[in-house]
Amino acid sequence: MHISQEGLSLIKKYEGCELEAYLCPAGVLTIGYGHIKNVKEGDTITQQEANDMLLHEMVEYEDYINELVKVDLEQYQFDALCSWVFNLGPTNLISSTLLKVLNNEDYKGVPTQIKRWNKSNGEVLEGLVKRREAEALLFENKPWENV
């Protein structure tokens, strides 16, 4: 499966787009839509480069999800997982209760597991609370845009 435009919209909303390198709330040098690889202080990019970087990175995350998830997914469920993995990384998915719950076909238990991941450095962040709520709603095919 591949992420849809709706999944990309969720990521873009919660990542925001910065065309100049900055320190994110977790203290990591970031640019574009949450891009953290090989970012140096003072780096700048164009909007098109930010969009291209996001699409390029999504291929890797899609592959991880397609490999790790052993049950059938609807597009909206896949999109929610793409946002979660994009934000948290595939390593967290591999070791998560979320993946265990999902692969046990407990689809109703997944939104609760999504929402558990709302901390950075042990501190609950309001932005992560909102993002996880939006991802949980999308996973259930409910409107998420107003979160």
What role is predicted for each listed range?
Residues 1-28, 33-63, 68-72, 91-147:
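Long, amphipathic alpha-helical surface segments
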Residues 11, 77-85, 113-115:
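Short alpha-helical scaffolding segments that buttress acidic/His motifs in well-ordered protein cores
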Residues 56, 83-88:
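Short, residue-level hotspots on alpha-helical faces of the histone-fold
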